[in-house]
Amino acid sequence: MDRNEGGDFPINTPNNINSSGGSYNNSMNNSSNNIGRDIGNNQSSRNLKPKPSQSNLKWIARDLKKKSVRKDSERKLKSSGVLKKKNTVMDFGEDDGGSGDDGNITEGLPISEGMDDLPSSSNSRGGSGNDEQKKQFPKEMNSPSSEYGTTSGGQRFDTLVDPDISLAEMEEKMRQHKVYQEQQQQQQQQQQQQKQKDKELSSQKKKPSSMQLSKKKHVAKEDSETLETIIGEEKKEVVFEVKPYFSHAILQATMAVFLIWNIFYFAYRAGWTMNRTDYITFSYSILFIIVEFISFLGSALHLNNFTNPCTFVLVVTLEQILAKRRKKHPTVMMYVCTYKEPPSIVSRTFRTAISMDYPSENLWIGLLDDSVNYRESRGWAHLQSVEKNFLYVLLQKAVYSVHNIRPPVTSQHEDPHGILNETSSKIESSTKEVIEAEVQWFIEYFLLNSWFGVGQEIPRDADDAERALIAKLRDDNFSPYRTFTKSESEKISNFTIDSLQSLWHGSAFFRPLIRSILLKKDYVRNFVSELNNQHRLRFLNTEALAMAQYQVLMMGRQELPWDEISSGNVRIDFDTCDGPIVSPKCTYLRRRKPPIPHNKAGNINNALFNESTKADYEFLGLLDADQQPHPDFLKRVLPYFYSDEGQDLAFVQTPQFFSNIYPVDDPLGHRNMEFYGPVMEGRSANNACPFVGTNAIFRRQPLYDIGGIMYNSVTEDMYTGMKLQVSGYKSWYHNEVLVVGTAPVDLKETLEQRKRWAQGAVEIFSLTPWGYIRGKLGWRKMLYNLDSCIYPFLSPTAFFYGASPLIMSIWTVPIVVKDPIIFILVGMIPVMVLPRVIQYMILRAKRPYEAGKSGPSLWVEATDLWRAEQTFFGFAGTYISSWREGSASIVKLLKARKISRHKLAMWNWKRDFVKKPVVCEVFRQTKLVNENDNAQESSGKHKAEQSFRTSNKESDTIKNSRLFLPNIILFVVNILAMMSAVLRFNCFQNDMWLLVVVAGFSFSTLWHLWSFIPMALRQSEKQWPYASSYHAHNIVLFLVLGFLVLLFVDVKVCIPRVG
């Protein structure tokens, strides 16, 4: 019987205080009756008063012996910490909240007489006297009165004197219990002292910054409960596992061999060079040693990323975590950033983002349109695509809620061959296609022609207030940088058809608002009804239209809390009305750019600080306009944030994957699998994953704490990731393809992109105090970030290697020695072979497989190793040209700030906040724009508000043709070097091995530049049809055959030796 209910108590319960019918009755009845009477004041139960029996006396001797043996065994187990039970008399110090449900302490004992009404265990838990019992319990157990059973009325049942033991035994047990408590206290004190020492040691190693201290203050909040406080588990919840996929011992041993062998190689080279008497050979050899040493440092710095190759494997899903913690799905804002992408690409990305598998009420999609002028047609197209996609999802959900199109489920005996199920699934898929077609058709018709059936409305005249509001809204100086008040929104919803048409033709940004009003009109439903009567529509009916009601809120501000990133905003919110159908909230945001717009960083910070508050969302996702997320993108990334109790995790990065690029058809190296594979995984294992600008989920608070996306660099993404690491935050990498994008396929756009990346690396390298970064992050993380910034400065080595074959073939200047065996053993193996062996071992290592993945992990192909070397030669000229732009931007910034480079770098990295803008919950009413601003905007002299000019392909080709020249020059130089080496091979027998090395060196350079030259000469907007990199193998074969022919044919073409 349930103890919470009234009724009989079972015999063997702790609430039944038993006594024997013999000599124990007189000593125990008083105490048991007193306790039973005191506790029974608040509760009631049936009395158990069995009649005394003389046979009960026979149990005493046997039961005393049995009970003493049982208690001794339990005492030993309990003192060793193996057994913790509350159903023994030994459990004096257990505190279970005053519960009477402590198990059986009277098993095998006779039933005493004279028992009063006893309380139920369920009602004794919540009594007011429980706290007093907890406080008085230890004292009463040590008091002499407890030994004789003269405890107070608030005493618990398990503190009663056991009638089966004597007074001396009770004293001995009390002494043992006291000793046990003292031992436990001593152990706890020792543990606390050890923890205090560990904290002091860790604080001495790394002192927390002021941002870390302030960050830990708002960690302990009511809404940030940990797993222990909710379900009472002591074991920490495991969300993911870090699994290494390559042996660290083998990897470190191979790197040690690489370093030691290179030291011997450079020592041998230096000794050989110092013994040269030829001035040309000596000078060239010194220069070659310097270039090789720089390459060695770059290789060692790059191999540092591979020291800890691990992959993160999720072991729980987001739903399981939220179910355990009893929490709801967090609110996520997904920002899609666009600048000059075509509206079709932006619309496709927005459609996939709004269709993600996530609760609609917790998902918010925002399109950040950073086009140059708000009057431009591109901005209107972006706004229309936002409305179209929002309405599409809303109508689709409404249709599915009205029509049940799920196929019937048949049992196996009814459909043993699966024919009925297969037919039902086909019917369901065809039905979904019809629904999507009908919804798409209606949206296109409704957006293009929203005035059908106007004659069905009853005409009425507009009043004076309506005309005044129309004139106010049509004022170009007042809209759309303004906020609608509640009264204005109500007036607009009640406008006449003539007023709505007047507003429709006044400004294109008011059309979404007018369409949301028109959709509620009766003639729209009548139009759909007519179509249904004519059998033109099957699923889209008036009931679905009634459920798919949405509202549009026009907001914009001329005065902004943070005016450095915007001088005015246009914001249009699409939200569903109160009803059963909920679609993700959508927002279109456009800013009026200030004189220094800060590009993408300013666009994101405007949305973060000026157009959102802390209560709006907890997590922030960033997507580029051409990156389409997987439906499970959020479900696969958000679990990482729940494994971080201290909220030190700032963001989780996912890889970039391009649908128009394949492993063998990637001549420009867009896949970059080496970086998105072991490099990112190795850094993530040390909590230092870089931010690549897109496909990442941020926690809003860390990004807000550092002042948003960083400025002073065109690669603001890498700068922001470094700033978060310096501020004490962690960043992880989830190697699963969850976002698919498109990459530039022509050489011109690729070179522009790589030049911008290299310029940003130069700016970050110049504005970073590396000593300060090393003190904050340590050597390893500092080298991670240095490797991301130093690669443009290694590009001159590629030019030197490219020009060396021609120099050596003309002047016959040796590299090391003329003996090929020594050159291969001492030079080729440490410099060229060992780094490739290390990379190949790591790149081709087998990754741990994770069940339930939504996308594949990036698998590194064999050609990716060659792509890394290919891009090193192919983009060398582009990287060198970025020095000038990066240095010029730094000099311009220093002149504008009137501060030294070191002071600017220290200020930029030490500050905890760029600026603290205060964002109001309610948007303020804007004022009229100043006449000076209007005149400046109309004149077109404002730099940030110039009209967008489409790119002129001819002018862009002429402007960027200088980026193609280094590749073409290197290609021609190496062709000449190979021809010279082939001809001299038959003339100078003493230099034959040197010429073989020269020919191989020049061939390697030509191989790396092979895919760039046709694209540079053709200037095509499409990808060069470069079928496979393995075509180079055929070229090697023909060259080897040519060498063999020259060896056996008696033809010698001698060229006089220069010098």
Swiss-Prot record:
Cysteines paired by S-S bonds: none
Active site: D370, D717
Biological source species: Dictyostelium discoideum
Descriptive protein name: Cellulose synthase catalytic subunit A [UDP-forming]
Region (Catalytic subdomain B): 701-761
Record's compositionally biased regions (Basic and acidic residues): 939-953
Swiss-Prot/TrEMBL keywords: Cellulose biosynthesis, Developmental protein, Glycosyltransferase, Membrane, Transferase, Transmembrane, Transmembrane helix
One Gene Ontology term from the biological process aspect of the record: cellulose biosynthetic process
Enzyme Commission numbers on file: 2.4.1.12
Domain of life, per lineage: Eukaryota
Region (Disordered): 1-159, 174-220, 933-953
Polar residues composition-biased segments: 40-57, 142-154
Regions that span the bilayer: 246-266, 280-300, 306-323, 790-810, 813-833, 963-983, 993-1013, 1035-1055
Catalytic activity: [(1->4)-beta-D-glucosyl](n) + UDP-alpha-D-glucose = [(1->4)-beta-D-glucosyl](n+1) + UDP + H(+)
Protein role: Catalytic subunit of cellulose synthase. It incorporates glucose from uridine 5'-diphosphate glucose (UDP-alpha-D-glucose) to cellulose (a (1->4)-beta-D-glucan), which is produced as an extracellular component for mechanical and chemical protection at the onset of the stalk formation, when the cells exhibit multicellular behavior during culmination.
InterPro entries, A to Z: Glyco_trans_2-like, Glycosyltr_2/OpgH_subfam, Nucleotide-diphossugar_trans
Record text about domains: There are two conserved domains in the globular part of the protein: the N-terminal domain (domain A) contains the conserved DXD motif and is possibly involved in catalysis and substrate binding. The C-terminal domain (domain B) contains the QXXRW motif and is present only in processive glycosyl transferases. It could be involved in the processivity function of the enzyme, possibly required for holding the growing glycan chain in the active site.
Cellular component GO terms, alphabetical: apical cortex; cytosol; membrane; mitochondrion
Subcellular location: Membrane
Keyword presence, Glycosyltransferase: yes
Binding site for substrate: D624, D626
